[in-house]
């Protein structure tokens, strides 16, 4: 097995929290940003002013971000985070305590809205990106 295949296999086994930590370490080590380039979404030639509205309609993958958790609602939100992510208690607790934090990434609009509603019903403040 080549070195790149070994790395890929190790990446597949990372939890969401571990993957987020890895991204931060890569950004710091190599001086790069994981944020997408600003012009990537608007690369269509001849696109007019309506391109922004069309892009928003075409978006099929969403991230659910836990923005804020009131201290009296942490336990309820923690339970929802564990249900949504499948994380263990420790990892979910770290996620809830380090808001804003992406809870689910690259999910359909329906799944993202359902996850957001669950988080808000538990008392947290969530958004879709």
Swiss-Prot record:
Gene3D superfamilies: 3.30.1390.10, Single helix bin. Pfam families: Ribosomal_L12 (PF00542), Ribosomal_L12_N (PF16320). Residues 95-123 have a biased composition (Basic and acidic residues). Residues 95-129 are annotated as: Disordered. Keywords: Ribonucleoprotein, Ribosomal protein. One of its GO terms (cellular component) is cytosolic large ribosomal subunit. GO terms for molecular function: mRNA binding; structural constituent of ribosome. GO terms for biological process: translation. InterPro entries: Ribosomal_bL12 (IPR000206), Ribosomal_bL12_C (IPR013823), Ribosomal_bL12_C/ClpS-like (IPR014719), Ribosomal_bL12_oligo (IPR008932), Ribosomal_bL12_oligo_N_sf (IPR036235). Homodimer. Part of the ribosomal stalk of the 50S ribosomal subunit. Forms a multimeric L10(L12)X complex, where L10 forms an elongated spine to which 2 to 4 L12 dimers bind in a sequential fashion. Binds GTP-bound translation factors. NCBIfam families: L12. Belongs to the bacterial ribosomal protein bL12 family. Forms part of the ribosomal stalk which helps the ribosome interact with GTP-bound translation factors. Is thus essential for accurate translation. This is Large ribosomal subunit protein bL12. The lineage of its organism: Bacteria, Bacillati, Cyanobacteriota, Cyanophyceae, Acaryochloridales. The gene is rplL.
